[in-house]
Amino acid sequence: MHKVFSITPFTTLDYPDKVAAVVWFAGCNMRCVYCYNIEVVNSNGNIEMAEVCNFLDRRIGKLNGIVFSGGECTANPLFLKLAREVKSRNFCLKVDTNGSHIEILKEAIGEGLIDYIALDFKAPKEKFTGITGSNLYEKF
């Protein structure tokens, strides 16, 4: 089962107008030629959900936002569970995504879990497979 790869405990760059932390989800369903997080993409992660929740508890009153990034956070089985944990602690949630798991995104949006989405448009259709190593353009 995929886990979280790592946590950046403090950032003022990754979530506009927020003091935030970044939860880096292991794994990705693409293999982009320009990926700068290949270690995250190729990992199964080593941080359990309970450890992430413990971190969130310790950051209440210190942060006002959490960023889910990766890899591809929406491909991870922990995504919705951790999004609910983030919102239950009254943090704003930003999601960095390649947009290929639209049903998961719809569910999260429907539950009011996501406050900000950064959608990474990888390439036009004719270049998509060559750049991403995937056939996910139509899903995007």
Task: Describe the role of every protein-language-model region.
Residues 27, 47, 100:
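Conserved active-site and cofactor/substrate-binding residues in soluble primary-metabolism enzymes
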